[in-house]
């Protein structure tokens, strides 16, 4: 999920897994990450807190050195499901649609509620059902 989806999408063209499950893949963090890190460190802090996810600004500087996440993800040809909650404040619909558009066999599923972590029983259930269907259909 999130940064894990970003990493999975980036490594999939080389690893070539049987399928790819991307839950709210976090490519959006890549855009402007060094500039955001500069602003945070200028305020006297060396970390950020996003919905309880605390990370050092060195992480942002390391991310800035990587290529565009969508370029890294190109070249994987297996089945893909991209899942996002419709009220996710950290990963936008456009990033998820862009990931889905990179792949030949991809499905984009939007789950109602639950935020970035699918933090309600109905959203978690819908997410798990979408994943189970994807596994049954593709793997």
Predicted regions mapped to residue ranges:
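Gly/Ala-rich beta-loop-alpha elbow adjacent to hydrolase catalytic centers
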Residues: 1-4, 8
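Conserved glycosyltransferase catalytic-site signature
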Residues: 5, 115-116
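Aromatic pocket-lining residues of Rossmann-like dinucleotide-binding sites
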Residues: 11-12
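The alpha/beta-hydrolase serine catalytic core
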Residues: 15-94, 98, 104-110, 115, ...
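Short, hydrophobic alpha-helical segments
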Residues: 135-139
């Amino acid at each position: 999920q999130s940064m894990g989806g970003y990493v999975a999408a980036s490594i999939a063209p080389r690893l070539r897994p049987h399928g790819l499950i991307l839950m709210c893949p976090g490519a959006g963090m890549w855009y402007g990450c060094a500039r955001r890190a500069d602003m945070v460190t200028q305020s006297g802090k060396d970390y950020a807190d996003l919905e309880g996810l605390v990370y050092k600004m060195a992480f942002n500087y390391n991310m800035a050195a990587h290529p565009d996440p969508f370029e890294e993800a190109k070249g994987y040809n297996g089945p893909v499901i991209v899942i996002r909650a419709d009220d996710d404040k950290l990963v936008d619909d456009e990033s998820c649609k862009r990931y889905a558009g990179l792949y030949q066999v991809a499905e984009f599923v939007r789950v109602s509620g639950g935020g970035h972590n699918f933090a309600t029983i109905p959203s978690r259930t819908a997410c798990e059902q979408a994943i189970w269907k994807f596994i049954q259909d593709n793997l």
